[in-house]
């Protein structure tokens, strides 16, 4: 089972709100997911991002691949740098 960390769209028309979820790569964007690890609100000024760091690191260590957008959000939060340091022992 290929696992991805990606965005699940919520909210109303023209006012999107996203949950950052861990899901099987074969399931639809807003379909079945394994676990919710955070939220992303691009409409707020500035955009609000809340990610459970422990859960994100756990899933990254288990081999989950983040989507491009989630990768940039994780990077801005400093989580990818921590994952890199854990993986390569720095």
UniProtKB/Swiss-Prot annotation:
What is a GO molecular function of this protein? structural constituent of ribosome
Q: Name one GO biological process term.
A: translation
Key word Transferase present = no
- Give the GO cellular component terms, alphabetically: cytoplasm; small ribosomal subunit
Q: Name one Pfam family in it.
A: Ribosomal_S16
Instruction: Provide the alphabetized UniProt keywords.
Output: Ribonucleoprotein, Ribosomal protein
InterPro entries in UniProt: Ribosomal_bS16, Ribosomal_bS16_dom_sf
Q: From which domain of life does this come?
A: Bacteria
> Would the keyword Ribosomal protein turn up in this protein's UniProt record?
yes
NCBIfam families given in the database record: S16
Q: Which HAMAP family match?
A: Ribosomal_bS16
Q: Give the family from UniProt.
A: Belongs to the bacterial ribosomal protein bS16 family.
Name this polypeptide is given:
Small ribosomal subunit protein bS16
In its UniProt entry, the species of origin is given as Geobacillus kaustophilus (strain HTA426)
Q: What is the lineage of its organism?
A: Bacteria, Bacillati, Bacillota, Bacilli, Bacillales
User: Which gene is the coding source of this polypeptide chain?
Assistant: rpsP
């Amino acid at each position: 089972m290929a696992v991805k960390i990606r965005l699940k769209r919520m909210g109303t028309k023209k006012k999107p709100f996203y949950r950052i979820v861990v899901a099987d790569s074969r399931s639809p964007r807003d379909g079945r997911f394994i676990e919710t690890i955070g939220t992303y609100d691009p409409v707020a000024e500035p955009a609000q991002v809340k990610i459970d760091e422990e859960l994100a690191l756990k899933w990254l260590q288990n081999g989950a691949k983040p989507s491009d957008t989630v990768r940039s959000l994780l990077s801005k939060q400093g989580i990818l740098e921590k994952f890199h340091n854990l993986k390569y022992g720095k």
